[in-house]
Amino acid sequence: MSVPFSSNGITVDLFDPTVGIPFDGVVGEGELDYQANTNSLVAHWAPTLEPELDYYEYSFSTTIGGDDIIPWTATTDTIATVDSLNLIHAQIYFANLRAFDLAGNPSFVSSSNGVTVDLYGPITGIIIDGLSEDEIYTGAIDSLVASWTDFADTVSGIQYFEYGVGTTSGNLDIREWTEIGPVLTINAGGLTLIDVTTYYISVKATDLVGNFSEIVTTNGITADHSGPVGTIATDSDSTDIDLQNDLVSFSGHWESFSDEYSGLAYHETALYNVTNASYEENWTNVGIDTTITFYGLDLIAGSTYELHVRGVDAVGNTGAIINSDGVLIDLTAPIAPLDLVGWFTTGRILLEWTANTEVDLGYYSIYGGTENNPTDLLFTSMENTVEAF
């Protein structure tokens, strides 16, 4: 009888191995949801710690668990990279993984959540100077505002916008591209805007994989730092006056102001007391009217008052003040003329008197008749020598 020999045994393995979930992308960069690469796909996974593990198989597909892009391929690594592909825009690609143990038992198939190929930049929208409507002029001296709508990226989505500023359309001679996040407005501060210079804001969008859109540019906004210009202001509502004895009202009018750029928005008026250098009536918006009457006043006799007018344009610039030549409040009648002398002949009467010295004298009234202290007005004169008949 021979000596018996024994094999080293065989273990019956009826249990399938386990396998983790594959992740799209390379190790250390997190889960990849989108990519711009059309040539390759990468996946990685945590190692299976079971001692019976023999190898892994991976595939890439356009459906979960499939292998239409890369068929099942054996590996002992925990990363799979495939090249020389021709991936399609907006298509989702899945990494699929299974493990085999030493007995040849396969694990279940585990699939990634997929990576979408994004080859194109965002779609551009509309941009305007301003927030709610397109502005043509700005009164700002150090900032510009723009807003935009209808930008879109239907695959990976918009990650951020960039803006720049120039003095010609599309140029960036004032401010180079500046990232501002996924916002729809920009208040570009820290600028030095020059009067009557037109500025253009350009914007572009970048999606989550780095594709950028075409550039869109505003139609331009012009800095307007000068207020409206006036010409003449006149005391009274018609012909200019220099004196009045009304203490409770004051009237004036003026030629409409003009503004070459943003345009006149409204006039403002005030009543100024020249004598005590203060405003009797403060500045009031009177719209585009060119006449004003102040009521309910308490004017002071002997004081001179001027009408002050200024214009405000559409972007808020206030122009220089123009003023009337002033009205003296006069409540004192001139004294009666002195030293009246009359020379009588058969053909005429010559009257002469000492001229009054009041600076506000208007004229003399000459009365005549056949009785003492006649009341019939014959005429008026500025001179102190007249012929009555």
Predicted features, each with a name:
Residues M1, F100-N105, T206-N211, V312-N317:
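Short, solvent-exposed loop/turn segments at the edges of extracellular beta-sandwich modules
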Residues P4-T48, S111-A152, I215-F257, N323-D360:
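Pro/Thr/Ser/Gly-rich low-complexity, intrinsically disordered linker/stalk tracts
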